[in-house]
Amino acid sequence: MKKTTVINSELSTVIAGMGHMDWLSIGDAGMPVPMGTQKIDLALTKQLPSFQDVLKNVLSELAVQKIYLAEEIKTQNPEQLAAIQALLPDVEVAFVPHSQLKQDLAKTHAFVRTGEMTPFSNIILESGVTF
C-alpha cells in the first residue's frame, strides 16, 4: 500500500505523470469541467472534502511554480484567497477572469472536484521541478 499522502489512485497517477509546466486544477463542487478533461471527483457531500484539504494533500506531492486564480476571488472569497496564499507564499500568482479560468481547464491534465461550496474556490497549479 502506498505510504505517501495522496492515496487516491487516479489523482496519484496524474501527479506522478506531470512534467515541468504541466497544469492540474482543483475546484469547488459547482465548477463546470470541459468535455475531454479528466475529472477526478472526490466530492462526497457539502464541504467534504474541502478545497483546502485537497489542495494541502496535492501540494505535499506536487512541486508548484505558479498558480492561476479567478480575479473575482479577491472580493468574493478573500478568506479562501488568504488561505491559498498562506500555503503558497513564495509562488507566483496570476489572476484571470473567472470565465478565462473555466476555459483554461481544457488545458489541464485533470480537474479535481472537491465538496467545496464557497465561491471562486478554484485553482490551476502549474508544476515546477524538484531540482
From Swiss-Prot:
Family per similarity comment: Belongs to the RbsD / FucU family. RbsD subfamily.
GO cellular component, one term: cytosol
Enzyme class: isomerase
Lineage: Bacteria, Bacillati, Bacillota, Bacilli, Lactobacillales
Annotated organism of origin: Levilactobacillus brevis (strain ATCC 367 / BCRC 12310 / CIP 105137 / JCM 1170 / LMG 11437 / NCIMB 947 / NCTC 947) (Lactobacillus brevis)
Isomerase is among the record's keywords: yes
Active site residues according to the UniProt entry: H20
Subunit structure: Homodecamer.
Protein name as catalogued: D-ribose pyranase
UniProt binding sites for substrate: D28, H98, F120, S121, N122
